[in-house]
């Protein structure tokens, strides 16, 4: 069975998404490109769009696209406490009919499993915790969190961002070897040095190391396109990478 291919709307860039009329306006293009689903980004909404989540959910259903919902927030705040807005974000995810809600780990200190379990059990959406580009998402804290969450039988999984290990200065293959059993969603991304940091690039511009890393992760995990989708013909570009990842 081929893995589900998801297009992350942010791959088109915030400016292009706005020019095209917002994330809802991208759905026909993404469907025509052959994708199975869309990752909706909260940071790309304006205030009015945040009030129209049910309408977005209906549009996703009409286009027969699965939904994932990404929020630019951390599960754990800087003081180590659970993000009090998590129930709100899960509710927003439910309104668009999302299968999963993606957040970053944040500053994990100690697992308050009962509090987190109460929040998760109140929702039909699966929480998937991602390694972002900050020191809080280095391999050691990610492992510690998922080991404890697994021991506590918490109903959550990991979003494995293939490119973000470069920002944290770690080896993606080593991370995959230790974290793959927790992974249920993959952000496909590769990056190259750019000044004192990195920048994401399209797969056609990268070497083949991304294939080895992808093959080290669960074969049935949905694959999200989070590298830049750019060009004069966005439909052709999107279709090219949907086909590439489906065959990889």
Where would I find each of the regions flagged by the language model?
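Hydrophobic residues within beta-strands of alpha/beta enzymes
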Residues: 38-39, 101-103, 127, 186, ...
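Short, electropositive alpha-helical surface patch
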Residues: 56-67, 119-126, 219-220, 235-248
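Alpha-helix termini
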Residues: 47, 77, 110, 174-176
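Active-site beta-loop-alpha junctions enriched in small/polar residues
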Residues: 9-14, 41-45, 70-76, 106-108, ...
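Active-site acidic/histidine proton-transfer and metal-coordination neighborhood
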Residues: 59-67, 75-158, 167
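N-terminal pre-domain/capping segments
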Residues: 1-87, 94
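Histidine-acidic metal/acid-base catalytic patches
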Residues: 1-11, 15-34, 87, 97, ...
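Short secondary-structure transition/capping segments
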Residues: 50-53, 80-82, 113-116, 140-142, ...
């Amino acid at each position: 069975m081929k893995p589900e291919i998801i297009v992350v709307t942010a791959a088109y860039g915030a400016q292009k998404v706005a020019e095209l009329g917002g994330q809802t306006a991208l759905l026909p293009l993404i469907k025509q490109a052959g994708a199975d689903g869309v990752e909706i980004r909260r940071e790309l909404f304006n205030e009015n769009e945040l009030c129209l989540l049910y309408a977005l959910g209906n549009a996703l259903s009409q286009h027969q696209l699965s939904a994932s919902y990404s929020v630019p927030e951390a599960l754990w705040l800087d003081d180590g406490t659970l993000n009090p807005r998590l129930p709100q974000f899960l509710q927003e995810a439910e309104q668009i009919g999302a299968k999963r809600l993606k957040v970053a780990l944040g500053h994990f200190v100690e697992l308050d499993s009962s509090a987190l379990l109460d929040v998760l059990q109140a929702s039909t959406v699966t929480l998937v915790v991602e390694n972002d580009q900050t020191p809080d998402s280095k391999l050691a804290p990610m492992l510690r969190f998922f080991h404890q969450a697994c021991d506590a039988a918490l109903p959550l999984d990991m979003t494995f961002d293939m490119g973000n290990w470069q920002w944290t200065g770690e080896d993606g293959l080593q991370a995959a070897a230790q974290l793959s059993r927790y992974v249920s969603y993959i952000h496909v991304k590769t990056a190259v040095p750019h000044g004192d940091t990195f920048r994401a690039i399209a797969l056609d511009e990268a070497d083949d190391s991304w294939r080895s890393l992808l093959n080290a992760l669960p074969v049935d995990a949905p694959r999200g396109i989070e590298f830049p989708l750019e060009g004069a013909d966005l439909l052709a570009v999107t279709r090219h990478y949907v086909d590439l990842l489906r065959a990889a």
